[in-house]
Swiss-Prot record:
<keyword id="KW-0963">Cytoplasm</keyword>
<keyword id="KW-0067">ATP-binding</keyword>
<keyword id="KW-0547">Nucleotide-binding</keyword>
<protein>
    <recommendedName>
        <fullName>Adenylate kinase</fullName>
        <ecNumber>2.7.4.3</ecNumber>
    </recommendedName>
</protein>
<feature type="binding site">
    <location>
        <begin position="7"/>
        <end position="15"/>
    </location>
    <ligand>
        <name>ATP</name>
    </ligand>
</feature>
<dbReference type="GO" id="GO:0005524">
    <property type="term" value="F:ATP binding"/>
</dbReference>
<dbReference type="GO" id="GO:0005737">
    <property type="term" value="C:cytoplasm"/>
</dbReference>
<keyword id="KW-0418">Kinase</keyword>
<dbReference type="InterPro" id="IPR023477">
    <property type="entry name" value="Adenylate_kinase_AdkA"/>
</dbReference>
<dbReference type="GO" id="GO:0004017">
    <property type="term" value="F:adenylate kinase activity"/>
</dbReference>
<dbReference type="InterPro" id="IPR027417">
    <property type="entry name" value="P-loop_NTPase"/>
</dbReference>
<dbReference type="Pfam" id="PF13207">
    <property type="entry name" value="AAA_17"/>
</dbReference>
<keyword id="KW-0808">Transferase</keyword>
<comment type="similarity">
    <text>Belongs to the archaeal adenylate kinase family.</text>
</comment>
Amino acid sequence: MRSVITGVAGVGKTTVLDIVSKETGIKIVNYGTLMFDLAKKRGLVENRDQMRKLSRDIQIDLQKNAATEIGRMEDVIVDTHMSIKTPFGYLPGLPEWVLREINASAFIIIEADPELILRRRQNDPTRARDEDSVESIREHQEINRAFAAAYSIFSGATVKIITNEEGKPDKAAHDIIKVIAVD
């Protein structure tokens, strides 16, 4: 079983996934962290901020290698992004070469009310985020749904939307456990 779980920043994904992992014992692998670890081993970077400055070809190579590693793992949840918002538009978080290697059985998107997400982002002093609005958060969540549908068409994996209601991360975690238990 390999499931991909995503959500926009501030949706509460880390909290929910911590509960899922504790209750199931399933390993959570952060795709970006795996890419960073590979780059660091090769001596390409010393910190995560340097990842953005690597050439496109090197980044694609790191993506492929991280995906290959994940593809060898059993019973794992991949924590990543369905789409990445840039000043130029949305980039796919799971390009074709990543989808093929990961071979996920399910794509799960954690969502929350955009107003709640905005409040969480505004109250998080540990992150330097771009200026956001309820509308831009709503748009990003809609884009994530569209990308998930496209990935599903390519891969044959199911798509499930899970709502993380305020103060109810346990409910969202249990909804996820029901989906991944089928695998």
